[in-house]
């Protein structure tokens, strides 16, 4: 008869048989072995879960498009032998640089753990931490436990992180407050203006950094999502690169309404030519402008003319200059690897002093990222700039993942690939360095 017969199941002979079977299984499978089996099962589930996440990422994110890399080839496609790389090539004169406060410690720990895991445990480059206030002992002790690399902690001088002596502070603060009223991102945060000015014209002169030739900028609360199995400093040196980036995107237009006009005027007045400049150009517009003329939006002694500055910031003409219009593209400077010689020269210093004198770091919300980028357009060739397309990086909700180009990439399924968004600038880059996308 089909079905379950409780009398048969609970018969004495069946019960004795099951008891005997359990005894034999216990002898054959002791407690330690069962623990190992459970552990292996947990590991298998974890591996399957991670594989599932990457499968979901690939289904929701198309692979990176093939590009013409003749002028900027990858330093690595896939994984190199990281142990061999670390032994073969000499360490460059380089350091990581992070500007942070004591309150940033959790985000700093997260960033350093990610960087050590994916790169620096093999290459052991030193860290330089900077702060506008002294670091406390808790901060320093925590950081020293995260890495075997050398670590230095420095404090910024007041004249490099604050209002300079020739600035009308009340007018500057009024201009900063007005940016908050207009909803400009970080526009009403005074320390943000100080930070952008510091990274535009002073960080490379800090006493702790003067001994270095190269730097890699790191910020709190970022993540590296691919293993970096080679030394970026070494390969940049070997390939004649000066500046490297991993994210290129468009700036918020209301943060830099006059930066491009002033930079373009500086370029023309100093007869500067570079094939890098085209990266920043949009459709042409005709406008005549003299950077030396008196302008109510220039300088900081014009408190009574604040309304004129506000109107100018929203003018459709402010991003144009003699037929050249700024496309808002820039390299995100929270991840940049560069040679200090890009900054440590009279050419760059003169450019910074000229731009600083306009007051744009206060009357507008100039970021160091577009400032560095436009300076690269003035002083570097496209052959001296490198796109680390094989690396993976996440800052806030902006994400680039090397996918099949990188090494052991763990892309973040919840975030869009910056190359695939309208705010990215990969199209401008590939058109600059070659013949565009190869799948067109």
Swiss-Prot record:
The identity of this protein, by name, is O-glycoside alpha-1,2-mannosyltransferase homolog 4
Q: Which GO terms describe its cellular component?
A: Golgi apparatus; Golgi membrane; nucleus
Keyword Transcription present in the record's keywords: the answer is no
Where would you find the membrane-spanning parts of this chain? 36-56
Q: Which residues constitute the catalytic centre?
A: 336 (nucleophile)
Which superkingdom heads the taxonomic lineage of this protein's source? Answer: Eukaryota
Instruction: Give ranges for the Lumenal compartment.
Output: 57-440
Gene Ontology MF terms: alpha-1,2-mannosyltransferase activity
Q: Which stretches are Cytoplasmic in the membrane topology?
A: 1-35
Top-level class of the enzyme under EC nomenclature: transferase
EC no. given is: 2.4.1.-
**Chain's role:** Probable mannosyltransferase involved in O-glycosylation of cell wall and secreted proteins. Transfers an alpha-D-mannosyl residue from GDP-mannose into lipid-linked oligosaccharide, forming an alpha-(1->2)-D-mannosyl-D-mannose linkage.
From which organism does this entry originate? Schizosaccharomyces pombe (strain 972 / ATCC 24843)
Q: Supply the Pfam families for this chain.
A: Glyco_transf_15 (PF01793)
Its family remark reads: Belongs to the glycosyltransferase 15 family.
Q: Where in the cell is it found?
A: Cytoplasm; Nucleus; Golgi apparatus membrane
